[in-house]
Amino acid sequence: MDLIETVRPLAKKTDSKILMVVLDGVGGLPLTVNGETELATAKTPHLDALAAESQLGLVELVAAGITPGSGPGHLSLFGYDPLKYVVGRGALSAVGIGVKLNAGDVAVRGNFASLGESRLIIDRRAGRPSNEKNAEVVAKLRAAIPEIDGTPVEIYSESEHRFVVVFRATGTPLGADVSDVDPQVTGVPPRTAMAHDPASERTAHLVNAFVTRAEAALADESQVNGVLFRGYSDVPHFPNFDEIYQLRAACIASYPMYKGLASLVGMDVLPVEGEEDALAGKVAALKEHWHDYDFFYWHVKKTDSTGEDGDFAAKVKKIELFDALLPELRALQPDVLCIVGDHSTPSKLASHSWHPVPLLINSRYGRKDLAQRYTEEEAQKGSLGLRRGTDVMPLLMANALKLQKYGA
């Protein structure tokens, strides 16, 4: 049975509050045989103090050996089996920036990329251009590709190297089962999109035509001169998060994909002031709305971005920046405070990985364990053991006294 259907009849409304902090891609690896991970290297006195008062463990977001994308990783943390509830990155990003998807449309996540001779990929993120440069390039593509063979094409800025394309159905629905253009490595050319079923053949044609026309339109660009696609999606549908858990839930995040996912499961997405991933703005939003909700999903992105860039020192710094503001979160006195990642992004690999992520749960009803720091190694000593991602929400609900007894 789907764990959601087990939890749903047990959930009850209470006044207790849950704060789930997701440090995106927080899990790491040592750079050397006898070295430390980014978490272990970081100076985190506040996380250490919290860990000494909490329960720790490790979480596999999908299954052993499976490297999660951000979408499946978050769905798992929210209690949705990522093998059952599948959604492409395109829909998450589109919804996150306020784009309405209609039945039959397909949204796809795009990366601006740097291409060299023979179309070989030099940089999958085109040097992470500024948001202003992103908007400039999107405007150029909009002028060059308003439609393809009668299919309307909409192009939207997201942030840095990220953008979203929506192919609008004009009759027959477009299929979303298409292979990625993005090979997720450098030194090779973009892949040709291939349909995996007849309904997706037109979508694959549209994608390949877009790639060709985009490269022509960007031929005068020195760095942002190619596009990569992944994460095709039509309109997804999920059981409502608030109804499952009897919560009023809010999302505090900066990046569109995470706001989109939260919106799709039914959370309210709160406005955040300041620069993207500005932690001060997120703290302010949490304080402002603290009395309006009983569940908060609070997201930190840069622990992932720095890992993807292969920048060990920068990832350590982002962890330390979060640690510095942790006392402000604790001062709100949530009944349950959870700190976890949606996947690991070791700087050593410069990509997501299959390694379990540390899980911390602090509540007045938790049993203390032997873990003394919030690190991968210390989490192995924790009383929570190795858990599936879908176990996290039931554990938080139980620690908040929001679950009734199961059975007689």
Swiss-Prot record:
UniProtKB keywords: Glycolysis, Isomerase
MF terms (GO), sorted A to Z: metal ion binding; phosphoglycerate mutase activity
Pfam family name, one: PhosphMutase
TM segment ranges: none
Enzyme Commission code: 5.4.2.12
Residues spanning the signal sequence: none
Keyword Isomerase: yes
Matches recorded under Gene3D superfamilies: Alkaline Phosphatase, subunit A (3.40.720.10)
Catalytic function, reaction form: (2R)-2-phosphoglycerate = (2R)-3-phosphoglycerate
One of the protein's GO biological processes: glycolytic process
Main function: Catalyzes the interconversion of 2-phosphoglycerate and 3-phosphoglycerate.
Similarity section: Belongs to the BPG-independent phosphoglycerate mutase family. A-PGAM subfamily.
Name used for this protein in its record: Probable 2,3-bisphosphoglycerate-independent phosphoglycerate mutase
Gene: apgM
